[in-house]
Amino acid sequence: MKRQFALGAFLYLFLVSPSQGGEFDAARRKMVQDVLSDTAVTSSYSGSSALSPGVIAAMEKVERHRFVPADLATVAYLNRPLPIGYGQTISQPFIVALMTELMKVKAGDRVLEIGTGSGYQAVVLAEIAGAVYSIEIIEPLGKQAGDRLKSLGYRNVQTRVGDGYYGWPEAAPFDAIMVTAAASHVPPPLIKQLKPGGRMVIPLGSQFMVQYLMLVEKQQDGSVTNRQILPVRFVPLTGGH
């Protein structure tokens, strides 16, 4: 697996090195094409054969290399997760796009994200939504992400350090909720904070067992439906649960 990664990284650098293309534009375009290809291949699982224009535009615009450690900037646009420290990762771009697509975020929506990480997913959401609220339980990561988002000028994202299992009740209700760590069950506080008609995307399963990305929809009468999307691998959700 390490050898395969090394070869892939070498080819990536050879084909889309910033020194050849000026900045990371070519690498980002290739990443988006890889994401679109994965979307088509997995359409029988996800129900999405294509991404909406808003999601594509966000993926094309947000500069992923600004959200990874400096020594990984040259491989930031590979379509795979990368470590960001503290045992955490920045999600695979395809998964970022798919989760965003599944939530059907619209302009003006209020979105809650559990697991800020580097802040990349929050920024992708912020390109579409009206307001994004993001919670990170690991204090150094949360502070770094908050500073990064401010420096990049994203004023429609609020971050805080805390236990995402309990959500952000004072900012609720939310049109959509995204959980970027695997839980054993859907946290009841998050269901409560989801608007009727809202959508939640969450990976369910333990760290050492099969995990599935789930789409949770809250009906107008308050009832909840779940749909299994596809197998995934996320770091575990920690905290109150």
PLM feature segments, named:
Residues 1-7:
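Bacterial N-terminal signal peptides that target proteins for export
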Residues 8-16:
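Bacterial N-terminal signal peptides
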Residues 10, 88, 166:
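Generic anion/oxyanion-binding catalytic loop in active/binding sites
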Residues 15-17, 91, 118, 134:
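Short linear Ser/Thr-Pro motifs
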Residues 20-112, 128, 143, 151, ...:
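Class I SAM-dependent transferase core
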Residues 102-223:
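Conserved nucleotide-cofactor-binding alpha/beta core module
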